[in-house]
């Protein structure tokens, strides 16, 4: 099927640790089996993209490439075999595979040469995505700054608590890192009946927001010894049974492991920089303690997105107090700088903004 458009604007990672390049890119001439053309309305900016830009996992073999993995979009065209969405549908864009075909990745061009992209990218005004990376939602009057979070931040927070940690109301929760996901962990933990929620961060403004959203106790991280001392003083002998690190900071991970209960589930959401190592004493793992990395909370978009959307629509999950800040695609590097500086909440790229 011939595409209705031939080019679009995108933010491109051309060189690691450098600002993104805003430029027009060329789309392929048609859609292949399982591909869907969407017009992106808004996209969330996730810590994972900061990691990509800074090559946290090691040298980037795919440069130049597109970025972004949580978005809100309109379907424009569908390729052969697509049955779960139709032109005119509104969809959440997500990186976790859902239902439908997993297509080949699209082949864009930038300056006449191939531009790499995965099954979903959201920092481009128009995107060709795999059918199983989008989930249809009702065409209601949605908050365009919140809906993208269903593609990663919200579904990850839910999945980390329910799937990875298998949290229950009698658990006590400790969270390191109160960024976009950390704040939502507080929100969802409250819905799941968790009464004791302790949070640690290096920014006082984030800790203040955490209290506003329902945290029981906040601790300002300055160094490992001080933080350990503050946590020991607060918990005494009743260590938390679920501990989640969203930072990827190796010192934070060590504290999470050391300060947790003997039968605790310690879940790692953040990823340490390539080459950084954590030192732990493994004996507790033989006697009930669990330490594991999370892959997006093992969320299932086709199930979790409708569930979370219903909670939002009924105000069970109240997000009017969840901080977001929107930027045009031309200002995406400003959004990245804000996120890296520790500004509270989620940075949103809004393709309906002209400047």
What are these regions (language model features)?
Residues 194, 250-316, 351-355:
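Glycine-rich phosphate-binding loop and adjacent beta-alpha segment
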Residues 139-223:
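Mid-domain Rossmann-like dinucleotide-binding core that forms the NAD(H)/NADP(H) cofactor-binding site
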Residues 1-6, 254-258, 302-355:
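C-terminal hydrophobic helical "lid"/dimerization subdomain
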Residues 28-43, 56-100, 138-140:
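Glycine-rich beta-strand-centered segment in the early N-terminal region that forms part
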Residues 224-237:
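Short amphipathic alpha-helix with an adjacent loop that forms part of the alpha/beta core around
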Residues 46, 94-133, 144:
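Cysteine-cluster motifs in flexible loop/terminal segments that predominantly coordinate metals
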């Amino acid at each position: 099927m011939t595409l209705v458009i031939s080019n679009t604007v995108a933010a491109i990672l051309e060189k690691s640790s450098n600002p993104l390049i805003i430029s027009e890119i060329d789309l392929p001439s048609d859609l292949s089996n399982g591909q869907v053309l969407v017009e992106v309305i808004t996209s969330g900016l996730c810590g994972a993209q900061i990691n990509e830009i800074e090559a946290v996992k090691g040298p980037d073999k795919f440069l130049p490439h597109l970025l972004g993995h949580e978005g809100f979009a309109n379907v424009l065209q569908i390729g052969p075999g697509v049955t779960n969405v139709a032109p005119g549908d509104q969809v959440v864009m997500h990186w976790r595979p859902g239902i439908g075909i997993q297509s080949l990745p699209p082949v864009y061009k930038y300056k006449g040469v191939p531009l790499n992209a995965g099954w979903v990218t959201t920092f481009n005004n128009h995107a060709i995505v795999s059918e199983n990376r989008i989930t249809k939602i009702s065409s209601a009057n949605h908050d365009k700054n919140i809906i993208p979070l269903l593609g990663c931040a919200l579904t990850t927070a839910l999945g980390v608590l329910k799937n990875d940690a298998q949290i229950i109301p009698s658990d006590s929760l400790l969270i390191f890192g109160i960024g976009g996901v950390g704040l939502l962990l507080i929100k969802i933990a409250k819905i799941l009946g968790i009464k004791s929620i302790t949070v640690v961060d290096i920014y006082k403004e984030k800790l203040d927001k955490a209290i506003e959203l329902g945290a029981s106790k906040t601790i300002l991280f300055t160094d490992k010894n001080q933080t350990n001392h503050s946590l020991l003083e607060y918990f005494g002998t009743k260590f938390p049974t679920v501990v989640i690190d969203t930072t990827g900071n190796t010192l934070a991970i060590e504290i999470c492991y050391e300060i947790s209960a003997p039968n605790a589930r310690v879940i790692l959401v953040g990823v340490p920089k390539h080459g950084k190592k954590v030192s732990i004493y493994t004996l507790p793992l033989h006697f009930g303690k669990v330490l594991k990395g999370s892959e997006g909370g093992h969320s299932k978009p086709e199930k979790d997105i409708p569930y979370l959307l219903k909670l939002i629509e009924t105000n069970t999950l109240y997000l009017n107090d969840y901080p977001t800040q929107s930027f045009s695609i031309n200002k995406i590097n400003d959004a990245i700088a804000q996120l890296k500086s520790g500004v509270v909440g989620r940075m949103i790229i809004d393709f309906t903004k002209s400047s």
